[in-house]
A protein has these predicted regions:
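Basic, glycine/lysine-rich polyanion-binding surfaces/domains
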Residues: 1-179
Length: 179
């Protein structure tokens, strides 16, 4: 058996008393001493921060990036404005789901696709095979960056505090849920 990969936050998880498990080949926390119900409720009522560094991350660039993404994803890429994300499916040629993913558009001319940790190799092979028919550049940056997800009703307030009051999200977000 191969050794499990560890995120940059591995030691912080241990220091916080996390119970670690094999998750798609990564040594990831499944719960902390307070228990999963308390963690769930805290996130729903306040804010939770999740280490998602194990997820696959792919930069998509090039003249045919939109056509490529329209071809390999189930969602309408053209509906995505700057600083937005959308949930999508990566279907095979018959329309069956290979994986689900999130597509981000952080800047003009560049998209960022986040895929599941356990499917990185399979998804990468599929996307690279499909990319042969497009003028597009795919870069697997999964090992280049750590990543966290900040979720819950107090997320915006906490992010603004951490950023010194800098606005990190657009004021009006399409499809946003407000509490």
């Amino acid at each position: 058996m191969s050794e499990l990969k560890r995120t940059i936050l591995y030691q912080a998880h241990l220091d916080a008393g996390a119970t670690m498990v094999d998750f798609g080949g990564w040594d990831m926390p499944i719960q902390y001493p307070e228990g999963i119900i308390a963690e769930h409720l805290y996130c729903r009522r306040h804010c939770g921060i999740f280490d998602v560094s194990h997820m696959g991350r792919i930069d998509v660039e090039g003249p045919d990036q939109v056509a490529f993404l329209q071809h390999v994803l189930s969602s309408n890429v053209l509906a995505l404005d700057l600083n937005q994300a959308q949930y999508c499916i990566i279907p095979d040629a018959n329309g069956y789901a290979i994986d689900d993913a999130y597509l981000y558009r952080f800047e003009e001319g560049k998209y960022f696709l986040v895929i599941n940790a356990g499917n990185i190799d399979k998804d990468w092979a599929h996307l690279m095979n499909e990319a042969k028919n497009f003028d597009v550049k795919l870069t697997n940056v999964s090992d280049k960056y750590a990543a966290i997800a900040v979720q819950g009703p107090e997320s915006k307030k906490i992010l603004m505090t951490l950023s010194g009051g800098r606005q990190l999200t657009p004021e009006n977000v399409k499809n946003a849920l407000n509490s």
